[in-house]
Amino acid sequence: YYLGPDFDEVAVRAAMDEAGVEDWAEARHVKDIHSVIADALAGGAIVARVSGRMEFGARALGNRSILADPANPLVTHEINQRIKNRDFWMPFAPVMMRARAGDYLANPKELPSPYMMLAFEANGRHEEFIAAIHPADRTARAQLLEPGQNLGLEAILGHFGTATGRHVLLNTSYNLHGSPIASGPREALDTFRRSGLRCLALDSWWLRKKDGTQP
C-alpha cells in the first residue's frame, strides 16, 4: 500500500523553517493528531493529511490526502474551486472501514477494495456521504480500509464516527490540479500555501493558516 518515500521530524522542522511558516500559519506539535483531525472534520473543516510513507499507485489512500465530511454537499465546490482548482463536475471518493461498507454501499459479494479501484452503488444512506458519490448515478469509487492497513486513518475514522455517528469520509489526493501529489514536507507546505486550504496535518504537526492569509 505505502511503498513511497518517508520523512522524519527533522525534515518537517527544516521545511517549516524554509517556508517561513510562522509568518502565515499557526503551527503546534500535538500528541494525538488523529483526534485533532477528526474533531476538525466533524466541525466542518477540510483537512490535508501528510503522514508516513507515501502511497505507491494510482490513488491517494490517506497518507497524502485531503479529507472532508462528505455529508456536506458544499465541500465538493469548496475543494474543486478553492483548493484543487479543477473542473466543478469532477467527483470525489469515500473512504470507510471495510466492515462498515454494508452501511453505505451495495456490495453483495463483499469484495475488497483497499486501493479505491472498484465502483459500488450507494445504498439508502447516500445522504451521509453525498459529496463523495457520483451525482449522475449515485455510485462511489470507494476505498474500503482493512484493519491495520493505515492505523492513523483508521483512528481518524473511528474518532469521526464517535463524534458524528457517520463512519465515512471524503478522500481525495493532496495536490493542485495538474500537479503531482505532494510527496514530502516541502511539497506539502508549498501546496498548502498555494491552495485555499486552511488546515494541514503534517505528521504530528497541526497547521492552521492565519486570518487574512491568501493562496
Predicted regions, residues:
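Flexible beta->alpha loop and helix N-cap segments adjacent to enzyme active/binding sites
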Residues: 1-215
